[in-house]
Design a protein with these regions (language model features):
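Non-catalytic accessory regions used for complex assembly or targeting
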Residues: 1-12, 30, 160-164
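Extended, low-complexity, acidic/proline- and Ser/Thr-rich intrinsically disordered regions
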Residues: 4, 59-63, 131
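Short amphipathic alpha-helical surface micro-motifs
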Residues: 4-7, 15-20, 66-70, 142
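Hydrophobic, Leu/Ile/Phe/Ala-enriched alpha-helical segments that form helix-helix packing faces
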Residues: 6-18, 109, 113-116, 120
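N-terminal interaction modules that seed assembly of large macromolecular complexes
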Residues: 9-63
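A short, surface-exposed beta-strand/turn
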Residues: 50-84
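Acidic, low-complexity intrinsically disordered segments
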Residues: 72-135
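Glycine-rich, aromatic-bearing surface loops/beta-hairpins
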Residues: 121-164
């Protein structure tokens, strides 16, 4: 079974979403990882928050964007390094992801972005004081288990971190 490039697949999938927020997909050669950054605009000046960045991805304390980072790489498990940075580990060895697993990750990435956008709106309206962004580990696990239970989870396609 041949492996395809995860970078190319993510780029095509994300571009096909016609997503309303600016995003950038990059390949980090040092860590051999793929990084997807999505920038959600903040409608007011937030309290000092290390996640707030300007359009050039530099830390900013003025009108800015909330920068969420999704990293695909050689990790042993999914983790959140700090608020707004999500590490998504491969479900197979050697930095390989199955197509079905990537679909589950994309679903929950979109969910996380919708949650972030909603929390920003609540923050702007004064209904919230802080952002609470976490990766839905349990939901991802349950989604995979549910798909396996109804035979909607096959390991047909394989995606590698390598850029071809």
């Amino acid at each position: 079974m041949t492996e395809k490039s995860l970078f190319e697949y993510l780029y095509q999938e994300w571009q096909g979403l016609r997503f309303q927020f600016p995003w950038q997909l990059t390949y980090d050669e040092r860590s051999t990882g793929i990084i997807l950054q999505v920038h959600l605009p903040s409608r007011q000046e937030p309290a000092s928050d290390h996640m707030m960045r300007d359009a050039l991805n530099k830390q900013s304390d003025q009108f800015a964007y909330l920068s969420l980072t999704f990293r695909f790489g050689y990790y042993s498990k999914d983790i959140s390094l700090q608020p707004g940075i999500f590490i998504l580990a491969p479900n197979l060895g050697n930095g390989t992801y199955t197509g079905d697993y990537v679909q589950v990750l994309l679903k929950w990435m979109r969910y996380t972005l919708r949650q972030a956008d909603q929390q920003l709106r609540e923050l702007d309206r004064g209904e919230r004081e802080t952002l609470d962004l976490t990766w839905p580990h349990e939901a991802v696990r349950q989604d995979v288990a549910q798909r396996q239970a109804v035979n909607r989870y096959g390991n047909k396609e394989r995606y590698s971190l390598e850029v071809y």
